[in-house]
């Protein structure tokens, strides 16, 4: 899995002009699923995400997790994280998991994440418009194959 983590003051996702998911302070996740991803990748990602200390404490240090601040997560599927840009000018996306596998894996990821913190989502494979107010900004890349 490849996940772009953005610390946000608020975020929302809309599909065809209708708000699908909306959060206040928390994390916006752009989630890509790879063909080799397994249950252990899912567990690792959830554990890291809910415990990653990237929110400021009273002294201004990044010392609090999304769980500590009682924040929320907006999770958006993003197969383009597996783009291959080595040849030509058009990215190839053959490195991403096939849609059926990726959809099931993304759903399982969100369900497991929702056991820890409130989660809103987009719709897998939909054309979505994502709006966010970055906080920091703080943007982190999590790759479950690099641990």
From Swiss-Prot:
An aminoacyl-tRNA editing enzyme that deacylates mischarged D-aminoacyl-tRNAs. Also deacylates mischarged glycyl-tRNA(Ala), protecting cells against glycine mischarging by AlaRS. Acts via tRNA-based rather than protein-based catalysis; rejects L-amino acids rather than detecting D-amino acids in the active site. By recycling D-aminoacyl-tRNA to D-amino acids and free tRNA molecules, this enzyme counteracts the toxicity associated with the formation of D-aminoacyl-tRNA entities in vivo and helps enforce protein L-homochirality. InterPro entries: Daa-tRNA_deacyls_DTD (IPR003732), DTD-like_sf (IPR023509). GO terms for biological process: D-amino acid catabolic process. Its main location: cytoplasm. The keyword Cytoplasm applies. CDD domains: Dtyr_deacylase. Keywords: Cytoplasm, Hydrolase, RNA-binding, tRNA-binding. Homodimer. GO terms for cellular component: cytoplasm. This is D-aminoacyl-tRNA deacylase. It comes from Streptococcus pneumoniae serotype 4 (strain ATCC BAA-334 / TIGR4). Disulfide bonds: none annotated. The gene is dtd. Belongs to the DTD family.
